[in-house]
């Protein structure tokens, strides 16, 4: 049997053992906890002195510093070029992480290897030293177990009830001399033979420090037992937690402590409260400190570790791949740490709502307390809602959090004033200021589904908050106290009002004050780009007056777009030098991300699909555009006799067609205005993707008109030069609706013939919306749904009629798409586009 197979078998056995032990512990712990009166536990908690809690948390955070001696010994033994301060900071972070997700200390060992591998040339010796540290976590307990074996600590009660524990103690105790002898005979460094002994002493002191923290928890909850008996129970519990491989020893450690103190006659409610306080002080507090420290550490260490690893250097491509993600992860560590701290802060102060309610019940001025309670609750909820925004480095979310911290501070100062909590709020506030200066964006996009989710989440949190307060008051039997119930009745609505006011103020600040940040290039730059590189079927719409422009740094390419509802809706493909499109889009997306806007492309071709895909977009087919090949177009032949009949009819009625070049006279514009107004019939003009009747816009291109025999304009169409591929398009097509004549046919036919005479080779007749969308059962559901709309809702909008009409000109159909981010909603994106088109 080779070593690899042995390792696999060992891993399977280890996992099986840990799983079986976890199931056993969970079942036993459930049985024990089922008999505990949680109301009595809450009563006991309400009796605890606050100053004692503060001292406990300080002691819990400080006790982990002892473990830093491992790293001090390690750095000195290997003569690492690293400052003592950095060693202490890094060690604290490692040990806090190891305490939560330890798996017998293997997590801490792995992180140590990653960090310190960069500071020594002898990697083998480093691994040997780290192995000693890992094993010494058990040898410290082994030394303490010896003290139980020799009856220095009294564990007789628990040993009499659980006899097999005695044999575990013997085995663990016997491990100590073996380890000391081995570490001295075969040390990792011959000049440091006593490293194993030093680590054992550090481990022993650290376990004693943890025991003191738990013992102090017992003193706080008035669970008085002799220290000698207590320490014996703690050692046995620690052994159980360590060998269980369960992160933090959760369950196994707690079960032994619960059973041990039960044998000493301590009420289970007090033991449970003692364990909760211990977990908070010895695990939660150090993690908070570690999160703060991690905002400033680990960046260069992790980077150098990956760069220097022998497994990655030979594989250059793989290294580049991993390094790209590694840099992203490292960059997010500070914001992630702060987001976690803000989350914990909101949770802690949500619990403190109970303190405000409790104080209010015994104070005559209920109204003041409940206004403060509403402010406190609102601030906590806002803090919680902006955790993701803080992680995403949004300035708006950080400002929300800063305002929330200030409101919580005010409510705390006027109610349950605690200097330690106010100090903590000040620390978080300072970290938020630092984060605000580093933030990469002003705000995140506002999406409807996110708003709905936040509303539902807020209602859920407020409901849970109400249940928590009500349940606690019931458990403490203080509902009998007389109070102003009318104030309680309006507490929920007052909270909602405060949240709405704060959100409204910040939203106004960012949506209006920061709207000045939006920039737009000059139209002259766009004209120069089109003249040099050509345009497209939509490029003439730069003159419509309802768009802004974004150019690249060298002014060789641009986009035309419009802002609407936290989105930048771009019309068509980029224009200009195709080699600059990547740079242009990257700059545009960076610009949009900074301002917190979504990016939507409307009516783009399939030519640049790979480019849009690179920016994390998905596509929806809007329909197809009819492009007529003028080289093949003719009114001759049997199939075209309908075209000839239409043209002949206009000739018989003395209706003429002509192209009028700008500039236009006021009289001519007034004639067109008369036709346009009658054609619109009080309907609203469309915008953005089409032009509108505007003298300045119309004066940018020729206009085709049809006149009756009195020389009055009865129909007109505006031309749209495209500046590419010898193509031309039309925009506005309007006629007098009271005339029973095929004026649209006449305009199209005359325009087609005129365009062909002028040497154009392509004529764009516009898009047939939803045409040829979702026709296969393999298509996306959203496209199949759109296809059904095309087929069955022709009465609301002439989808099929529009395609049939254009098909008689035998065009080539080119697809047009909507491009939107993959995490956006299609229907919300379509809604924003429609709002842009229908509202100027």
From Swiss-Prot:
Keywords: Antibiotic resistance, Cell membrane, Lipid metabolism, Membrane, Transferase, Transmembrane, Transmembrane helix, Virulence. This is Phosphatidylglycerol lysyltransferase. Belongs to the LPG synthase family. It is an enzyme of class 2 (transferase). One of its GO terms (biological process) is response to antibiotic. Its EC number is 2.3.2.3. GO terms for cellular component: plasma membrane. Pfam families: LPG_synthase_C, LPG_synthase_TM. NCBIfam families: bifunc_MprF, flippase-like domain. Disruption phenotype: Strains lacking this gene do not have a detectable amount of LPG in their membrane lipids. They are also more susceptible to defensin and have a higher affinity for cationic peptides. It is a multi-pass membrane protein. Inhibited by cadaverin or RNase A. Residues 30-52, 111-128, 183-200, 251-271, 359-369, 472-489 are extracellular. One of its GO terms (molecular function) is aminoacyltransferase activity. InterPro entries: Acyl_CoA_acyltransferase, L-PG_synthase/AglD, LPG_synthase_C, PG_lysyltransferase. It catalyses: L-lysyl-tRNA(Lys) + a 1,2-diacyl-sn-glycero-3-phospho-(1'-sn-glycerol) = a 1,2-diacyl-sn-glycero-3-phospho-1'-(3'-O-L-lysyl)-sn-glycerol + tRNA(Lys). It comes from the Bacteria. Catalyzes the transfer of a lysyl group from L-lysyl-tRNA(Lys) to membrane-bound phosphatidylglycerol (PG), which produces lysylphosphatidylglycerol (LPG), a major component of the bacterial membrane with a positive net charge. LPG synthesis contributes to bacterial virulence as it is involved in the resistance mechanism against cationic antimicrobial peptides (CAMP) produces by the host's immune system (defensins, cathelicidins) and by the competing microorganisms (bacteriocins). It is found in: Cell membrane. Residues 1-8, 74-89, 150-161, 222-229, 293-337, 391-394, 437-450, 511-840 are cytoplasmic. SUPFAM superfamilies: Acyl-CoA N-acyltransferases (Nat). The chain crosses the membrane at residues 9-29, 53-73, 90-110, 129-149, 162-182, 201-221, 230-250, 272-292, 338-358, 370-390, 395-415, 416-436, 451-471, 490-510.
